[in-house]
């Protein structure tokens, strides 16, 4: 079996990745790493792993040595050296942080305050949105797993951009996420009394996912795309809903737009275009690798409205990373990801 290592296993994304991979029939999770909990058994940190695994957190160096595929679930700036070591040893590295999502070092420094530490390997990375880059992913050993907000927005807009149907300078992306998107670290904003029974935007006009969204949408459109992106925190654990507003180049018919989306995504296992009249909801994608898209039209403003929903921990992080791994290893893309949302 393919041996898997997770570096950053005790954060929310790393723990979710472990939970999913333990049920994958074709891989073995062989090693875990955590700086904060080195030497501790993972089931002492997350009790849901009791009797499921007795893996002990060790050094990142040892994980790379032992494993065939390495997942890095680390804060920005910490994955490049590990990825370089993995590539030098002919391993696959799937990074779930931000280190490889932007192609421009200048943009990365502007938004993240750091330069690339291993600039020579950035040209080897592929942006891991399977529905966009599947063929490139098949041939790649270094994957930049997309951010959670960008995943909803990019899947929501791709059919329109690929067919040059909308204007590129007035796209509004209004997104709401559960608090797991902020990570496991303690912050005032995610402290229960601060987040419970309220709803508010954050990092307005300054969220680090903005350049990732614009770069990927621009590649789809083969032209510069500008977005107004505003994220909000919902008082729930998991899930994202993005409401996207865009202006068509010409008069559009909602039935024709729906037909376009249905045809575009007909072979995509994890993207579901809802029937006209339905509205996408977090409830129906929770705990799955699915993206649900619903399409609407504001007739008064001649505006297309797309609602795109995912589970931020799965299709927005760990599940999409496994989907990328499956593609690279030649497995069925849905291996280990045949998940159905609970009805309640």
UniProtKB/Swiss-Prot annotation:
Active site (UniProt): 148
Function: Catalyzes the NADPH-dependent reduction of N-acetyl-5-glutamyl phosphate to yield N-acetyl-L-glutamate 5-semialdehyde.
Pfam families assigned: Semialdhyde_dh (PF01118), Semialdhyde_dhC_1 (PF22698)
Cellular component terms per the entry's GO annotation: cytoplasm
Family per record: Belongs to the NAGSA dehydrogenase family. Type 1 subfamily.
Keyword Transferase: no
Organism: Clostridium beijerinckii (strain ATCC 51743 / NCIMB 8052)
Cell compartments where the protein resides: Cytoplasm
Full protein name: N-acetyl-gamma-glutamyl-phosphate reductase
Superkingdom, taxonomy of origin: Bacteria
SUPFAM superfamilies: Glyceraldehyde-3-phosphate dehydrogenase-like, C-terminal domain (SSF55347), NAD(P)-binding Rossmann-fold domains (SSF51735)
Reactions catalysed, as given in the entry: N-acetyl-L-glutamate 5-semialdehyde + phosphate + NADP(+) = N-acetyl-L-glutamyl 5-phosphate + NADPH + H(+)
UniProt GO BP: L-arginine biosynthetic process
Chief location of this protein within or outside the cell: cytoplasm
Assigned EC number: 1.2.1.38
Matching SMART domains: Semialdhyde_dh (SM00859)
InterPro entries, per the entry: AGPR_AS, AGPR_type-1, NAD(P)-bd_dom_sf, NAGSA_dehydrogenase, Semialdehyde_DH_NAD-bd
Pathway noted in the entry: Amino-acid biosynthesis; L-arginine biosynthesis; N(2)-acetyl-L-ornithine from L-glutamate: step 3/4
MF annotations from Gene Ontology: N-acetyl-gamma-glutamyl-phosphate reductase activity; NAD binding; NADP+ binding
């Amino acid at each position: 079996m393919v041996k898997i290592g997770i570096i950053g296993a005790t954060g929310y994304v790393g723990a979710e990745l472990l939970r999913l991979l333990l049920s994958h029939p074709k891989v073995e999770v062989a090693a875990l790493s955590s700086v904060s909990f080195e030497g501790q058994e993972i089931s002492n940190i997350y009790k849901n792993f009791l009797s499921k695994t007795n893996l002990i957190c060790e050094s990142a160096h040892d994980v790379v040595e032992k494993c065939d595929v390495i997942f890095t679930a680390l804060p920005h700036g910490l994955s490049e050296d590990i990825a370089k070591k993995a590539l030098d040893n002919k391993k696959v590295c799937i990074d779930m942080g931000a280190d490889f999502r932007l192609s421009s070092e200048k943009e990365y420094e502007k938004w993240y305050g750091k330069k690339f530490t291993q600039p020579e390997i950035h040209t080897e990375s592929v942006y891991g949105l399977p529905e966009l880059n599947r063929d490139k992913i098949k041939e790649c050993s270094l994957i930049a797993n997309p951010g959670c907000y960008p995943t909803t927005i990019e899947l929501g807009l791709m059919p329109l951009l690929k067919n040059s149907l909308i204007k590129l300078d007035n796209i509004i992306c209004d997104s709401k996420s559960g608090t797991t998107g902020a990570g496991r670290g303690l912050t005032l904003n995610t402290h229960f009394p601060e987040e419970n029974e309220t709803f508010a935007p954050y990092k307005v006009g300054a969220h680090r996912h903005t350049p990732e969204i614009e770069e990927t949408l621009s590649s789809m459109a083969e032209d510069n795309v500008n977005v107004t992106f505003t994220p909000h925190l919902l008082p729930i654990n998991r899930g994202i809903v993005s409401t996207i507003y865009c202006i068509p180049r010409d008069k559009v018919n909602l039935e024709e737009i729906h037909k376009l989306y249905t045809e575009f995504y007909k072979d995509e296992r994890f993207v579901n275009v809802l029937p006209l009249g339905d509205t996408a909801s977090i409830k129906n994608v929770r705990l799955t690798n699915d993206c649900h898209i619903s399409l609407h039209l504001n007739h008064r403003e001649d505006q297309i409205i797309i609602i795109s929903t995912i589970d931020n921990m799965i299709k927005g992080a760990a599940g999409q990373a496994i989907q990328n791994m499956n593609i690279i290893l030649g497995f069925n893309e849905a291996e280990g990801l045949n998940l159905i949302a609970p009805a309640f």
